[in-house]
Design a protein with these regions (language model features):
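Charged, long alpha-helical assembly modules
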Residues: 119-260, 264
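Non-membrane alpha-helical secondary structure
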Residues: 5, 44, 73, 108, ...
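Short, conserved structural patches
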Residues: 1-55, 206-210, 216-221, 225-292
Length: 292
């Protein structure tokens, strides 16, 4: 609060006026940022991004991805990402309006990858992005891959899950730090969803049967930002397995059997946060509680 004595405007009125100004700051509701993933087997010489991509059926073993490990510690805000993509956002945007804006915008995967590495201060990865994008396109046999930025309750999933923030604002969600590597991987997952990838797996069972495998991301992974009730999903991967008669049985019997196998979907949900009971005992930092 600030107070100052001010002289009267008219000299024949005696005394002074006391002017008081008070500033009231309203704290935004707390928000968490999180994603859901699978624990993957670590192979010597493999990169973090390479392991993540294998989890959604993209084996890019012939492409060097180790340099992307430098993104693991970098944080990017959604607001900064939208600005880098040339998408204007009103300063007073509400959470519902922000969800609608994000869900209604799609950007080219290449542009998104470049914006992420640039904001993370890793400009040296811009050339690596070209090789990465070409490798993904070669696997899918497609070009012009697009990424939907947001999600609505009953619509397709985008890069960011639907933001749920009781009492929060769109501006606070735009300023939450999100892991750059998570953004990169999730962007690729969204862009490649619904497209089958040849895994390169082909088995011959003693000349009796042969099996070929393709995989597709039916539902992409997502990154969640929000308060209690916010949810994030891992990628739901569907495998297409074709069994055919091998060389030893080809003259006796013919088998051509397609099989579809779905991986279990993982969901993470914030059920409590920033309460005294959840504070870290040694540092006192606020924490969130999740249901997976």
């Amino acid at each position: 609060a600030f107070q100052k004595a001010s002289p009267t405007l008219l000299s024949f009125f005696t005394g002074n006026r006391l002017i008081s100004v008070s500033a009231v700051a309203a704290l935004s509701a707390p928000l968490a940022e999180f994603s859901v993933g699978s624990k993957l087997v670590v192979v010597s010489g493999d990169s973090t991004l390479g392991r993540l991509l294998k989890g959604i059926g993209l084996d890019l073993s012939g492409t060097s991805l180790v340099a992307y490990d430098g993104l693991a510690q970098a944080k990017i805000t959604p607001g900064g990402l939208l600005a880098a993509l040339g998408i204007p956002v009103a300063a007073d945007i509400g959470v519902g309006e922000l969800n609608t804006l994000l869900a209604g915008r799609s950007v080219a995967l290449g542009d998104l990858l470049n914006a992420i590495v640039t904001l993370a201060g890793q400009n040296s990865l811009l050339s690596s992005n070209i090789a990465l994008l070409q490798a993904i396109q070669a696997k899918l046999g497609l070009t012009n891959l697009m990424v939907q930025l947001g999600s609505l309750a009953d619509g397709p999933r985008g890069l960011f899950a639907q933001i749920i923030s009781p009492g929060g604002t769109g501006a606070s969600a735009l300023n939450v730090g999100v892991g750059a590597l998570d953004l990169l991987f999730t962007s690729i997952g969204v862009a490649t969803s619904q497209h089958a990838v040849d895994t390169g797996v082909s088995l011959d069972v003693l000349g009796l049967l042969t099996a070929t495998v393709k995989a597709a991301v039916i539902e992409p992974p997502s990154i969640a930002i929000g308060g209690i009730g916010a949810q994030a999903y891992n990628a739901q991967v569907r495998s297409f397995i074709t069994l055919k008669t091998g060389s030893l049985l080809s003259g006796l019997i013919k088998i051509d059997l397609p099989l579809v196998v779905d991986a279990v979907t993982g969901v993470g949900k914030v059920i409590d946060m920033c309460t005294p009971a959840l504070q870290a005992p040694t540092t006192g930092k606020d924490r969130a509680k999740f249901q997976v």
